Amino acid sequence: MNASVLEASYPISFQKKEAEKLGEYLRQRQCVNLIGMKRVGISNFLRFFLNHPDTIPTYINQKEKHLFIPVDLNDLVEQEIYPFWTLTLKRIVDVADQSDLSPEVKAKVNDLFVKSIQFQDLFMVIDSIRHALVLIGENGMYPTIFFLRFDRLKDKFNPSFFDNLQGLRDAANGNLAYVFTSYRSLVSIFPEARANLSVFSQTMYAKPAHESDMRIVYDAYRKRYKLTLQPPIEKALFAVIGGYMQYLQLGLIHLNEVESSTLNTEKDILETLLSDERIVLQSEELWESLHVEEQKILMQVVKSQQVDALEQERGRYLWDTGFLVGEKTLSIFSPLFEAYILHLEHDESKKKKTAHLTRKEHLLFTLLKEQLGEIVERESIVEIVWPESQEFGVSDWAIDRLVARVRLKLREQDTPYEIQTIRTRGYKLTPLKE
């Protein structure tokens, strides 16, 4: 158990249905593709699953020893194949060092990492991973690698990539399992690997959480950050967020910043959250993650228009991931997201009339201008623009979208600056060349 991880303190009943299903797959050593809408709470659930001391005996096996190895692709400085495998090997070493493996085995695993880094050869890195996983298996542990945000590699796929993943499983005699998290299925992200993926990946969808699970998360935040919300406000908050974890986190931040005593109804909560730029940006990220046909279906639902059988088939993702709920009468999972969709057209027309910078856009521009001509890294942007969200994390999409908005408005305002993207590092504001 990692005591510093908040989710490790959740009751073992947290998201029980999902934990039972994932645990059964891992008991059978099957690989899983865990799919959910962006920021729905997969990371929150997995932090619980990976760190709670009772996860393995409760949901997998009381007698077996399992080694969970999380590899978060957000930690990749470069979204390339070689850094990916190097990060994977490093995380295996990190987890092995903290495990019950003998000092001799730990030393061997560490030695594999050191040698592979010295030669900087892709084949040697993958071979070192193979040796490390075999060592772990031979010493009575079942390794499971959790590749978090695996879709970040979608542009770097090559035919041998999944062959190498399968090769590692074969070398471990089937004792190695993978869990891939993504917002779309691996088959749709890597269509060239369809044949490989069908062999070893089971599909599991993560939908917005039930209110009882949201209550667990809320209570943990409330105790850690000493939040005080009146029961009617709590009830209204749960009603408008619809089980969406990022809305809960951003909503609590917003309500902690404003005078919540003036808020009495669900309508009050909805209106104040809709005024928060962070929540609007999160809703936009959700909307932009959808295909045009899926967006059209959601627009039909909020306008109470019929969705026919063909549209339902094409928009299956909306039902699988929980964007849409209900059978006879369809509805959007969250009144907050529904309100965003209804305001889309109005917001678009409003954007065309003004090029004024919003608060976060102004923070970003000021930061870049203060370091004119210098690279400002993503971490610095998060620290200045999203200080309240550092613990929860800020997605690449949110940063890129904010930069794109400022870039567009600078052109509309005819300012003498432009924003340059520095690949894998950050952004730089430079004077326009005449």
Which residues does each predicted region cover?
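The catalytic "switch" region of P-loop NTPases
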Residues: 3-5, 141-144, 154-240, 254-258, ...
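N-terminal pre-P-loop "Q-motif" helix
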Residues: 10-22
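P-loop NTPase nucleotide-binding core
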Residues: 24, 28-154, 158-159, 242
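Winged-helix-like regulatory helical subdomains adjacent to P-loop NTPase cores
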Residues: 234, 239-321, 356
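Short capping/hinge segments at domain boundaries that bridge a core fold to an adjacent linker or tail
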Residues: 291, 323-349, 429
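The N-cap/first-turn positions of alpha helices
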Residues: 294, 360-364
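DNA-binding patch around the recognition helix
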Residues: 325-326, 352-357, 399-434
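Positively charged, aromatic-enriched patches within helix-turn-helix-type DNA-binding elements
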Residues: 355, 364-401, 411
